[in-house]
């Protein structure tokens, strides 16, 4: 079957924002207007189509990224609705990796919020073009121009309105399109009765006058903002610049094309206005998705590496190219089992065919191919370049794996996974629960790369790690509901890390003789601190075979295993370089095991002089409080070993930005609530790891039963 929509008429977009900005409601309206659903479900009533998990409907938030496909004016729009809560940041990250464009939804009252900054930064890292939708224009305190200023002030984004609202709050009645200079005026809240008029026309003047608005004022405002838009876009388009300086009229099509080009090049962010809940501005936002966000043909060919030659390669978006796709999400479906979501970059794929998982070097059979709408599905026979779909039957594929034609191998850039910052102990209630818990945790970890499951080597307890309390709360809840596992859950603990702060060299010597074959391993290793976030790096600098080549991997393995259980308090060690530069071996007694043990001894010896340190996660905390509570809040931050970075006024509130250790933030919601009579709010997002103070380090070591030496 031939493809239904051309690549030029395909859009792969994400809808992303801070929690509660109205992303899911916006997506619901998109589905309603594109004919995908025939009844609107409200998020706050737990009836949203895209928030299909029980936990999502109970909490009124998005937890997983739901995928759906819609059609708009002859175009296919593949949409991924992503979570806004910081604990589910991997869902945003893996979605952005496979999308071509995004709609950033702002709450028009608050503008850019902490998680907006996080998702914006992630989108910038992946070079994703964006349009901005100032939602909730009907809300008390909604301010389109304040929201615009926060894009520049907090994100440094070159954002400019391509629309301006007519009115705000209860008086939000319409939108002016600055490109076409036409207005849409809404006479009901269903988005069904829309009057379109030309700005400045008699009809426009009469319509606004009938609603008690000053038409002249809005005509003037529209002309002023259109002038600013042309001036901004002229920086990226010489033809428009020439016409602008010559005082010539700029045709609508030319202006649209220039905005599209600057947006796709990630130089410019068009800003729109609306209220998804009141059905205002959603159709215009859909038009902007088609007009300004890229098709798969507009973005550079996907880059990768040929695993056989290690040479760089690429796959242009075309059905004629060899098949290449990236698996970006694994999900367990109660009806069809394990689902692997993937984005096709090039070529086509039929159900029942074979592909090569080049990341794992394993052949996989594609059972069925499904087009997803949240958690419902439609079976399809073929997928084409630019499509997003889910496959049944992939046994070895995990998040970030490349799937390709067996005869044209390529490994695409994978998905970076952030380190977990919080952990807790889980204990099955019965023997039956113990057996089921292992399976449940394994399946949940397959779905979510930021969720880690480990066994404490000393106590045998199962420890689960994740991105925050809500993240682990939801996963434990899923374990109980979906897998029927009853478990006792410990209190949340901080996921500390350990590292070396000084360079040193150390010898690891292991020799054992007990009748028959002995054990002999001898290594000299130089340890140096690595850059933050760079992880562990191993270098083999052996010359002359003093440590035979076949034992070098065992040395690296011995170091990695030792680093999993750090030297100070048993926390994983990070950001260390190790250079194996000398050693000796025995012709008969040397073995992989002996060299593994020797490497482990070298690291423990190095710890005596390498100034080992414990690192703790530092959170970027944003606290919003009434002015009269500002003094209390500054006291809270200081008492929690925090550091205030900035303060800004917003209406009658003060916004405090600070870095605070995660360990000090447990229970802060209760403290803030009582200090502000429930009027204060806070958001936190992981920012970086930092050394704990010496006194705190000693407490941690004492608690974990280790000695500082």
UniProtKB/Swiss-Prot annotation:
Biological-process GO terms, alphabetical: ribosome disassembly
tr-type G domain location? 8-297
What PROSITE patterns does the annotation carry? G_TR_1, G_TR_2
UniProt-listed InterPro entries: EF-G-like_DII, EFG_II, EFG_III, EFG_III/V, EFG_IV, EFG_V, EFG_V-like, G_TR_CS
Query: Is the keyword Disulfide bond in the record?
Result: no
For this UniProt record, the keywords arranged alphabetically read as follows: Cytoplasm, Elongation factor, GTP-binding, Nucleotide-binding, Protein biosynthesis
Q: Which residues bind GTP?
A: 17-24, 81-85, 135-138
Q: Quote the protein name from its UniProt record.
A: Elongation factor G
Species of origin: Lactococcus lactis subsp. cremoris (strain MG1363)
Q: What lineage, starting at the top, does this entry show?
A: Bacteria, Bacillati, Bacillota, Bacilli, Lactobacillales
């Amino acid at each position: 079957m031939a493809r239904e929509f051309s690549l030029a008429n395909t859009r792969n977009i994400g809808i992303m924002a801070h929690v509660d900005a109205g992303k899911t409601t916006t997506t619901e309206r998109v589905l309603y207007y594109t004919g995908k659903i025939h009844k609107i479900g409200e998020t706050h009533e737990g009836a949203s189509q895209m928030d299909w998990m029980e936990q999502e409907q109970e909490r009124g938030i998005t937890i997983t990224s739901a995928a759906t496909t819609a059609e708009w004016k002859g175009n296919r729009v593949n949409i991924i609705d992503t979570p806004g809560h910081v604990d589910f940041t991997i869902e945003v990250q893996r979605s952005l990796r496979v999308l071509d464009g995004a709609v950033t939804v702002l709450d028009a009252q608050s503008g850019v919020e902490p998680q907006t900054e996080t998702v914006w930064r992630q989108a910038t890292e992946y070079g994703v073009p964006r349009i901005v939708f100032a939602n909730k224009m009907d809300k008390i305190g909604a301010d389109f121009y304040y929201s615009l200023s926060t894009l520049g002030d907090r994100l440094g984004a070159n954002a400019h309105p391509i629309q301006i609202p007519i009115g705000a709050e209860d008086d939000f009645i319409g939108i002016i399109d600055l490109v076409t200079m036409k207005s849409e005026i809404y006479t009901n809240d269903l988005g069904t009765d829309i009057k379109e008029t030309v700005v400045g026309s008699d009809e426009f003047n009469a319509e606004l006058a009938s609603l008690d608005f000053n038409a002249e004022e809005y005509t003037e405002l529209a002309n002023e903002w259109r002038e600013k838009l042309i001036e901004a876009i002229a920086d990226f388009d010489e033809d428009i610049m020439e016409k602008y300086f010559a005082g010539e009229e700029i045709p609508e099509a030319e202006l649209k094309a220039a905005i599209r080009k600057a947006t796709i090049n990630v130089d410019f962010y068009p800003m729109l206005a609306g209220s998804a809940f009141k059905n205002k501005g959603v159709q215009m936002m859909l038009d902007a998705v088609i007009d300004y966000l890229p098709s798969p043909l507009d973005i550079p060919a996907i880059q990768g590496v040929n695993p056989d030659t290690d040479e760089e390669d690429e796959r242009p978006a075309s059905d004629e190219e060899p098949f290449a796709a990236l698996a970006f999400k694994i999900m367990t479906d109660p009806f069809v089992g394990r689902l692997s979501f993937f984005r096709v970059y090039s070529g086509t794929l039929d159900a029942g065919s074979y592909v090569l998982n080049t990341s794992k070097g394993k052949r996989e059979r594609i059972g069925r191919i499904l087009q997803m709408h949240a958690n419902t599905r439609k079976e399809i026979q073929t997928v084409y370049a630019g499509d997003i779909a889910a496959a049944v039957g992939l046994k070895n594929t995990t998040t970030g794996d490349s799937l390709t034609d067996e005869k044209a191998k390529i490994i695409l850039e994978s998905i970076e996974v952030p380190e977990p910052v919080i952990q807790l102990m889980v204990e099955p209630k019965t023997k039956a629960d113990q057996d089921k818990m292992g399976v449940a945790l394994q399946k949940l970890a397959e779905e979510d790369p930021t969720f880690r499951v480990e066994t404490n080597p000393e106590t045998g307890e199962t420890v689960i790690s994740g991105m925050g309390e809500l993240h682990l709360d939801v996963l434990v809840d899923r374990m109980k509901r979906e897998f029927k596992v009853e478990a006792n859950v410990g209190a949340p603990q901080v996921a500390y890390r350990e590292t070396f702060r000084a360079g040193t060299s150390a010898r690891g010597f292991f020799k054992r003789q007990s009748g028959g074959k002995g054990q002999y391993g001898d290594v000299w290793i130089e340890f140096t601190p690595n850059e933050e976030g760079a992880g562990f790096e191993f270098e083999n600098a052996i010359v002359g075979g003093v440590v035979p080549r076949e034992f070098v991997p065992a040395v690296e393995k011995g170091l990695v295993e030792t680093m999993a259980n750090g030297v100070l308090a048993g926390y994983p060690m990070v950001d260390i370089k190790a250079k194996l530069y000398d050693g000796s071996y025995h012709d008969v007694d040397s073995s992989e095991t002996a060299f593994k043990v020797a490497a482990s001894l070298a690291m423990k010896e190095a710890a005596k002089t390498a100034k080992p340190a414990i690192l703790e996660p530092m959170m970027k905390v944003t606290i919003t409080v009434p002015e009269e509570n500002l003094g209390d809040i500054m006291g809270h931050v200081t008492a929690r070993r925090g550091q205030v970075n900035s303060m800004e006024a917003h209406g009658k509130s003060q916004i405090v930005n600070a870095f605070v250790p995660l360990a000090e933030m447990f229970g802060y919601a209760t403290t803030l609530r009582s200090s502000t009579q429930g009027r204060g709010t806070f958001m936190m997002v992981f920012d970086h790891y930092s050394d704990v103070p010496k006194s705190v380090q000693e407490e941690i070591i004492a608690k974990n039963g280790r000695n500082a030496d």
